[in-house]
Amino acid sequence: MLPFWKRLLYAAVIAGALVGADAQFWKTAGTAGSIQDSVKHYNRNEPKFPIDDSYDIVDSAGVARGDLPPKNCTAGYAGCVPKCIAEKGNRGLPGPLGPTGLKGEMGFPGMEGPSGDKGQKGDPGPYGQRGDKGERGSPGLHGQAGVPGVQGPAGNPGAPGINGKDGCDGQDGIPGLEGLSGMPGPRGYAGQLGSKGEKGEPAKENGDYAKGEKGEPGWRGTAGLAGPQGFPGEKGERGDSGPYGAKGPRGEHGLKGEKGASCYGPMKPGAPGIKGEKGEPASSFPVKPTHTVMGPRGDMGQKGEPGLVGRKGEPGPEGDTGLDGQKGEKGLPGGPGDRGRQGNFGPPGSTGQKGDRGEPGLNGLPGNPGQKGEPGRAGATGKPGLLGPPGPPGGGRGTPGPPGPKGPRGYVGAPGPQGLNGVDGLPGPQGYNGQKGGAGLPGRPGNEGPPGKKGEKGTAGLNGPKGSIGPIGHPGPPGPEGQKGDAGLPGYGIQGSKGDAGIPGYPGLKGSKGERGFKGNAGAPGDSKLGRPGTPGAAGAPGQKGDAGRPGTPGQKGDMGIKGDVGGKCSSCRAGPKGDKGTSGLPGIPGKDGARGPPGERGYPGERGHDGINGQTGPPGEKGEDGRTGLPGATGEPGKPALCDLSLIEPLKGDKGYPGAPGAKGVQGFKGAEGLPGIPGPKGEFGFKGEKGLSGAPGNDGTPGRAGRDGYPGIPGQSIKGEPGFHGRDGAKGDKGSFGRSGEKGEPGSCALDEIKMPAKGNKGEPGQTGMPGPPGEDGSPGERGYTGLKGNTGPQGPPGVEGPRGLNGPRGEKGNQGAVGVPGNPGKDGLRGIPGRNGQPGPRGEPGISRPGPMGPPGLNGLQGEKGDRGPTGPIGFPGADGSVGYPGDRGDAGLPGVSGRPGIVGEKGDVGPIGPAGVAGPPGVPGIDGVRGRDGAKGEPGSPGLVGMPGNKGDRGAPGNDGPKGFAGVTGAPGKRGPAGIPGVSGAKGDKGATGLTGNDGPVGGRGPPGAPGLMGIKGDQGLAGAPGQQGLDGMPGEKGNQGFPGLDGPPGLPGDASEKGQKGEPGPSGLRGDTGPAGTPGWPGEKGLPGLAVHGRAGPPGEKGDQGRSGIDGRDGINGEKGEQGLQGVWGQPGEKGSVGAPGIPGAPGMDGLPGAAGAPGAVGYPGDRGDKGEPGLSGLPGLKGETGPVGLQGFTGAPGPKGERGIRGQPGLPATVPDIRGDKGSQGERGYTGEKGEQGERGLTGPAGVAGAKGDRGLQGPPGASGLNGIPGAKGDIGPRGEIGYPGVTIKGEKGLPGRPGRNGRQGLIGAPGLIGERGLPGLAGEPGLVGLPGPIGPAGSKGERGLAGSPGQPGQDGFPGAPGLKGDTGPQGFKGERGLNGFEGQKGDKGDRGLQGPSGLPGLVGQKGDTGYPGLNGNDGPVGAPGERGFTGPKGRDGRDGTPGLPGQKGEPGMLPPPGPKGEPGQPGRNGPKGEPGRPGERGLIGIQGERGEKGERGLIGETGNVGRPGPKGDRGEPGERGYEGAIGLIGQKGEPGAPAPAALDYLTGILITRHSQSETVPACSAGHTELWTGYSLLYVDGNDYAHNQDLGSPGSCVPRFSTLPVLSCGQNNVCNYASRNDKTFWLTTNAAIPMMPVENIEIRQYISRCVVCEAPANVIAVHSQTIEVPDCPNGWEGLWIGYSFLMHTAVGNGGGGQALQSPGSCLEDFRATPFIECNGAKGTCHFYETMTSFWMYNLESSQPFERPQQQTIKAGERQSHVSRCQVCMKNSS
């Protein structure tokens, strides 16, 4: 009975609905039963629903209340319609969501209802008053890594940065004095245990330990360290010329040589040549005696490459005295000595095991400041302030001031009026990528999920569109530790290059003195000379109880022991030794989630992964650097005699020729006159670093000028060819060219003998002017390391230093050695009650049986459609492509080689002595001086100031994570960069003419297996062609689809009689046969009679089941109406960064908001007016080290520097003055004096930040660490995946057994395997061609088979007749998915290329020309519609450009992306018949077609020829079981077999199939596992009942029918008598057991449904299974002779929409659910594809009657959420013991 107020409310609503002019009946939506009114259809003329024509419309408005027709109405009465008795129609489609009903009047107050469930989280309340500043919180956990911020504008000079990367190695400093001895360091860690010494010599009996005899000579000592580098020797005289080396390879043909120059006189030595490549070592030749000719001293050559490794040196001098020999054998025990004195305290004992937790320590020192906290919540909006008085009028407009500080937050202004729509602007140019949006609001923390099951590695899907980075959600609670997943397949990553070293951190503060180290391991035994061994120290106190160790790794299972004798009883026996570990119990109830363990130690690096797939072709690279200059070509042949000057001959003008081929690159022309200034071009890309120019004289420092404004565009300049310019200066040294070809024979040079004169001596010149100071020299190379100075005296000890601050925590120490065994701990507390053990182990192991392989298992069911696999490995290298188009013209080449040296000038007279020139370059190092006399000790110095920061030490071990450092200063926003120029679009190439048909090429090699193509469109059926000539034999085809069941064959001919054999003796009973293959599924049985009520018990939760296959995607549901705004969702998965969208249109200015977080970088602002000069700022912090400054002015003459190393080759000098006497060689100069060291130049300005370095190459794999200690026993792992089929084992040992008794007749075996192929039959005669069969119906599309190997080319067929276009075929059913292809073989590993120098980032290349049409791509997936970008701002109209010249054809474009499959176009006219194409490759097997109409039986053909023997095909899939054949002939009696070995004991498993099935539901997303001894048949989803056409059909949760293998919101269709079935066209519903996932606010759909559907498994049990119920909160015991499977709660029945529902038989295991849920099931609307928990769903459970008396009235009570399970009866599922 409804309450009074509800009835009144219903009456009011009904009355309101009937009064309305357009009222509707109530409509049930979903199952919520909400009343809907038709307010939305008010005053509309159109009908709300279409009206069926089979019904008449009665206008009831004109029939008054008294004019109603009588019950037996005739047709003549007004408003009367014939009575239509129609059958009840099917349930209609779900109606649209009705409008919201009118609000009813307020009802009377009802009775106080029961307390409701805990309400949902309320809306956030109003902001409170700002609270007082709280105490400083403890440092938070490390947050997740933030989203990378947008590139901000360049900032002002920031605070001092952290230390830069290690610079290049500096010059070796002068060796410092030897430092004082340091304080003793902290105690080191224990060393490794030394090896045991040899046995010592016997000691003497008495206590007089005299000195032993002299030992044998020790082992030869190791070679001493290399001595210091010797002084550089003086340069030796030039040696004699060596013998000629072996003849080199002949060079390539050089270019034709230039005409030879006229010779004028003796040639001078040429310029030094370019540094050559490192030569090969010369082969040894006998050295002939030569004489030395002194040549002119050449220029100093470049530093040569390192020489080859020298030969092994002579044996060194005898080594130092060897180390002491090993200790001798242990002597005999000595006599007892006198009692010694009290010994010193022994060393502390080894560290005991970890003790219990100590008392809390003292408060630590204050920590470093924590990181800046997250922005707090915005405070409450303050009240508006009072309006101030009006200010004075402002003055004239001033110049824009500098940016002011950030103003306070303004009030929210009133929204302005809506403006008129602006005119659509022209589409702007593509904008730059927009800035990344801010992070979204964080999601609510999700519910703590159950421990995940180990998932199988999914195949990688296609790369989806690049998603935008989602917001960072609040971190959810840590989930339970999942199981260790299998190792994934090797990734296809591309090997990155080795990364650069990281930036060093700040130097740490001085640490306090470390604690005393652990005790070192015992050292090697010391020498015993006169001392006596001390007495052993007393044993240390027992350590405190340590924590439990980690589980060790499980040992291997031992063999079964021999069964022991029955023991007798004894009263005084001592307790026996500890028994062996028992067998593992059943899995326990899942424990609570443990605390998060410490992070594991870093594992070894994995093996190198497979080579990654080739990346996409990158843009064309930049022009590479010029190659090295090749070796000089061979000398050309002498030229022919010279001819007259061709320039004097006037050439006759010939006819215009055809355009010639493009000429070679011309010689560089003279520089033209400078043109007028052109329009400023766009800013170029970052250019390459130029060659170092000639040093100019240092200029005066200019004052920095202000940045000028951009000038106006200049007038386009005219280009007038200028006069030839002067000869330029020599260019920079070119790179070494490639090896040139031998030149052609050159022209003969003219050498006029009358021009060869001795040069006349000139007059003496005037003294020259003082030369300009030369440019400062470049920094010299680092000097060679100086010699080690003499060891100074030890200075006096300085005063103690000031006590440093407390140091940071030291790095975490390495794991100490295992401590000594501690005192046994106290006995632990009693453990929890154990789980019932498993069945006992089998008996003693019998003699080994004879092994034989078992039969092949049946084929598995078709798997669900897998996810799209990873991109396969890169296919084999394709055929060479066609010749590419002509490339772009190359860049201008570098300057050519230096010209030939000029003629020597006439020798002048000796000039006067010039003025003193600038200081010369530092000479070579001087001869080292002799060692000085050792000085006296100096007086004690003052305490020194703190020393400089030392050089970085070697890389230390990885430390523990440090505390958070203080947050650095925020950088200043930098200036925005200028916009780069847009690239020039390429010119589209003209479409070429269609080429002629080429000749048929030779057969190419067989290609690799390609990926399966997408199904093409259904083609039009053609007429039957003529019969082709028989093709050549094809290659083996792919395995065929499983064929239909064949008809029984005819009886074969009788076999030959077998050989007679002796009668065998009666055998012993044989062992039980192996279990046969699984038979075909039986037909469904008739419904059984209702069983007796059973009892139930609740087993413990089994281990998590294996991950189920992914279900198919459901059908797309219809678009629902927009729901209300949902609660904030859970944190989404981070998507990949989306591509940046276009620049949006400017929005309407908003009201001033609250102070936001620091905004992203602004767009570049316009250039402001120059501001006034600011005040002098505070002294800034030290800046970063600047880049290398420009060369400073010439310094004062420094002191004599240390001897430098041999310098690099100098710049080529000016030509020397002519020698006074030709051909006279100068003497070797004396060694110059040591030069002065210049002063250090001024510090340069800070350089620009360089581009990021290239990622370094992958480092070498580290050495394998020492093996770790054995771990404790691990937790038993979850059930592993079914492993691959093992290889056939070796045949077992065959021992002839005794004769067995006759065995029981075995059951019918399953179908045997396919027999081996028979022998090759004889070749038959060729058969005649049969009659063409009838055309079959088109079949459904088959699965995409793997691409077959390319068949051999067939003979060309006869041309067929023109066919008429056939009717389009019927669309076939989609076939099952093809098998996943085998993984391709790894490609050959390429040779390692040389590491290239890092190139600068190249500019984007010009767009290529339109490439040739690519092959038709596979149909692409439908992409999501991208958001429409806002139109950009209209750009300025540019000047009209001149017509550009035709560009050179671009590089061929890359192959286009696969195109989207266009919709089929209209049918075209029949085309002309084309020529016969070459025979195509064999197609993939087609999908299985529909069964065609049975044709008439053809005439029997003649016997065909015997075909050639085909290759043995791969075994096909197992066929259907055939019909039983007719009984064969009785076979001959077989030979007597050998006596078999005794069989192995039978396993505890069943030797027969019981057929008793049991279903278990996990009520979670995890698939449950069958109990031990049960056989898993299938897994699925837990179906409770189906509501169809308002009738409910219930499933017994204990029967297999409640576990369906696939899930769908509507797994059924409805069929009527008119042979028509409908699917998803009615309002049918399904109900499923659900999980413990949180109840959603709105219906869920698509993949979100998965987390709410319970999983199940169907098992075959060895014996009958029942459920028993206690009707109390105590779990009932199973009856005698039964054992428990699981425990649970007594679930009886359920109801949902209307009167639908069902129940469970109490003896069925389905009445005992393992988890209690107030709403244990979820309702799914079949047609809509959504699922939800509705208020009408009710579950009924057995009540706990423990505290109530029978036959007394139940007491009404409301049970809250926390107490529900204590009022529900418990149950247990039990199975009868089969043992």
Curated annotation (Swiss-Prot):
* Limits of the Collagen IV NC1 domain: 1555-1778
Write down the PROSITE patterns for this protein, in alphabetical order: NC1_IV (PS51403)
PTM text: Prolines at the third position of the tripeptide repeating unit (G-X-Y) are hydroxylated in some or all of the chains. Type IV collagens contain numerous cysteine residues which are involved in inter- and intramolecular disulfide bonding. 12 of these, located in the NC1 domain, are conserved in all known type IV collagens.
Give the UniProt record's GO annotations in the biological process aspect: basement membrane organization; cardiac muscle cell development; dorsal closure; intestinal epithelial structure maintenance; post-embryonic digestive tract morphogenesis
| Keywords recorded for this protein, A-Z | Basement membrane, Collagen, Disulfide bond, Extracellular matrix, Glycoprotein, Hydroxylation, Repeat, Secreted, Signal
Biased composition annotated in UniProt, kind: Low complexity: 144-163, 360-369, 531-545, 913-931, 1015-1036, 1151-1170
Q: Does the keyword ATP-binding apply?
A: no
Intrachain S-S bonds: 1570-1659, 1603-1656, 1615-1621, 1678-1774, 1712-1771, 1724-1731
Q: Where in the cell is it found?
A: Secreted, Extracellular space, Extracellular matrix, Basement membrane
Glycan attachment sites: 72
Q: Extract the InterPro entries matched here.
A: Collagen (IPR008160), Collagen_IV_NC (IPR001442), Collagen_IV_NC_sf (IPR036954), Collagen_superfamily (IPR050149), CTDL_fold (IPR016187)
Chief place where the protein resides: secreted
- Spans annotated as Disordered: 89-643, 655-1187, 1200-1285, 1336-1530
Could you give one GO CC term from the UniProt record? collagen-containing extracellular matrix
Mind telling me which SMART domains this protein's record contains? C4 (SM00111)
- The annotated regions of Gly residues compositional bias extend over 434-443
Signal sequence segment: 1-23
Written domain comment of the UniProt record: Alpha chains of type IV collagen have a non-collagenous domain (NC1) at their C-terminus, frequent interruptions of the G-X-Y repeats in the long central triple-helical domain (which may cause flexibility in the triple helix), and a short N-terminal triple-helical 7S domain.
**Subunit composition and interactions:** Trimers of two alpha 1(IV) and one alpha 2(IV) chain. Type IV collagen forms a mesh-like network linked through intermolecular interactions between 7S domains and between NC1 domains.
State the protein's purpose: Collagen type IV is specific for basement membranes.
Name of this protein: Collagen alpha-1(IV) chain
Specify the species. Answer: Drosophila melanogaster
